[in-house]
Every structure is written in C-alpha cells, then in structure tokens.
C-alpha cells in the first residue's frame, strides 16, 4: 500500500524527535539565512558557515605565535639550540661535536642547512628564519591535509575543514613549536607531501617509490616523524600492491645510503651524537599522556565514522595512520625530555581522519537518525567548543591587556641587558637561557639537556661535569632577570585583576 508521500505503509519513516524538529526550524533556518545577499542552497550556506567558523578559529589562534615571533626572546630551549647549529652551518663550523664534550647534536643535518639557506634567501637571521619557516610549514600541512582527504574520501571541501581544524589546534595547543625555530613542522610538511604524493600514485596504480624516497629525505630533516612511512609501507603490504617489494627495498636502501653519506661527511662523531644518551621510564609517559585530551574529541569523531565505514579504503587507511601515530607518540614519550612534538604525527592523522569523517558523515548510524546536516553541525560546534574551552587565551589578551603586550617587550629588554653583561665576561660562558649567550657572541659550550641525561643515566657525576667545565675554562652566568617567553596567559586572572 502506497501512502501519499510515496512510502510503503509498513516502512513509514519515524517522525523526527522534537529536538530535531526544533533544530531544523531554528538552527537550520538561521544557517540558510546567514548570507542573504545571494540565493544559496542550504548545503552551500552550511558549507560557508563551517569554513568561516573553523577559518576564524585558525586565524584567531595564529595571531599570537605570529606576533610573538618579532621579539628576541627564547620561546623554548630548543630554539637557541637549533639556532646555534644553524650558525655553525653558516660559518662552516663542525655540525657534530666530540661525543665526550658537554654539547651534543642528535638531529639529522638537513634542517640546519635548510634554515640557514632560507635565512640567506630572505635576508633574515637564522632564529627568525626558523620561526618563519615553521609558520610556512604549518600552512603547507593544512594544504596537504586537504589534498590527502580529497584522494581518500573524494571531497576537497571537507579536506579543507580538516586542514583548518589542524591549523587551529596546532596554533592553539603547540605554541612552543608553532612560530618557533624548530625543525619538527617543516620535517612533517615534507613527510606530508610524501604522503599526498604516495596516495596519488597508488590511486593511479603507479609506482609509489618516488614518494617513499621523499619520505626518506624528510627523515634526514627530522627523524622522529615515523607514522607516515610506517603507514605507507604497511598499506602497500596489506593491499598486496605490485610495487610493494620494490618500494620497500629501494627506500630502505636509500635510507641506509643516506646514513652512510652522513658518516662519510661528518666522520665518526655522527652516529654517537645521533644515538644520544637518554633515560627512559614510564614516568615521562604518564606525565605527558594527559596532553592528548586536546585531540581526544577529534579522535572520537573520527573513530565513530571509521567504525561505521570500516570496509572502505579511507577508513582502513586512516585506522593504520592513527594507530601508528599513537604508537609513535607513546613510544617517544617513554624518553626523558620528550615534549609535545611527539604527538605531531598523531595530530596530523587526526586531522586527515576528521576531514574523512566530515566527508563520510552520511554513512554513519547517527546520521540515519538525525540527518547528515545536523550531524556535521554538531561536529563543527563540538570541535570549536573544545578549541575555545580553556582559560589560556593569548590572542584575546593580546588585544585586551596592555600588560600582556608589554611583557614580551620587557622580556626582550631583559635578554639584551643580560647579554650585554655576558659579552664582557672573559672566556667561555654557560647560560641557562642559551639565547643570552648567543646574543652575546659566545660559543655553545654546555648543552644542559645532554648534561642532565648524562647525570640521570650515571654516565657522569656532578663532580666530573664541574671538572670538565673548569678544564674548558667555562664560567656559569647567573641570570637575574627573566629572559624566556612565558607571559601570563590566564583570561580569568586578567578579568579578576584588570581594575
């Protein structure tokens, strides 16, 4: 029996719940009327609102790290550490020191040359060049996410949403790396380009070996971005790709050849530096794991879609990628001194997963109940709320608080003043804030991280370290003024104390 709406009598669709009907009339009508200057469909208008909302969040959170980059302050200790080695490349000095010294370099070489070249091309100092390059890399990663989701899920638009969320969450939650002189983001951008190229070639049934070789290059820029190559190699083997053995063999040989070339160029110091002394334990993992709360919601949204679409290639690939990203993150957090950059692989995988989840929202069980439009509205709203739900609001304070703006200017003044005192000290000097010694023109003579790890692992004692410093004529500078970029970013504190 046919009803007036064309459905069968026994298959009448249930009436939407009262909340859903209210939602359609209230929120749905609002979305359709947001842009009244031109006749847009409901879908077009929703799409524009999604882009506007996530795009505004990305711009909002990027304002602070971009503004902060102008100041001569140490954003994070690795900033000055990287700048010192970039200076070494610029001046033709050794890049990998004597393993028995008090300094070490456990990063592969390409980033130091890349940043030094970038600075030379754009007439910037190495510190500023590294900061600028990290912002460029972040934007490139967002573009790569868009292209990757287009291949996996067939939607450039929803890929762009994943990219915008990635910009926002990184600028929001990784401020010691975004806009800082650190090679992690640029290395990940090279790796992300390799992933995009890999998927494009696999989709076209072409040999993905060139893309795997690009990933090898990325590994010599920054060596701990391992989730993407593990995912791609596993995918080739799982899908029994006819180029799998060739790709694995050639890329593996290229990686070994690269290591051999580095040993030839940098001599016997290279491997001992790369295999730096480090302590390991569950304590570091437990101290860091709470940081995953920031992407937990995104991972939940992705997982809900992936389980509903688990038979699709997109879901299976992202399951591999997220799984390896989580594995890489937890593994690295076992090492003492490892920070938020260990989760960058996982955040990138989550962003790709979010884009695919938006594209495939109509395939989920919840979509069958509330409709794909409402489901996507909920997803966008939830992601935005998680981004904003924090007392730490640097960008807001940048506009609201004179004291907040003045704090970094004051910190730069402190650093320059401290550097002027170090500059007149005779001989080699150790600075807790390495940028002070660098600004004073002093060489890099004590790596506090290496010294700390030597002490933790029992490879040195405080007495042996003191003896080495005395033998090298190293004096410790006692800082009296704050010289690191640690402005008070609590919005609640500002509200309570503004009068």
Regions found by a protein language model. Name each.
Residues 47-54, 252-253, 361-394:
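Signature aromatic-anchored transmembrane alpha helix within multi-pass, membrane-resident enzymes
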Residues 129-154, 161, 168, 193:
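Transmembrane-helix motifs of polytopic, lipid-linked glycan transferases
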Residues 80-103, 110-113, 117:
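Extracytosolic helix-loop segments that constitute the early lumenal/periplasmic catalytic or substrate-binding loops
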Residues 135, 227, 336-374:
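Hydrophobic/aromatic-rich transmembrane helices and adjacent perimembrane loops
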Residues 192, 207-223, 229-236, 253-258, ...:
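Membrane-interface alpha helices of multi-pass inner-membrane proteins
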Residues 35-36, 41-42, 228-253, 276-281, ...:
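Perimembrane helix-loop-helix junctions
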Residues 382-499:
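Extracytoplasmic
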Residues 153, 186, 191-210, 303-313, ...:
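Membrane-interface transmembrane helices that cradle and orient dolichyl/undecaprenyl
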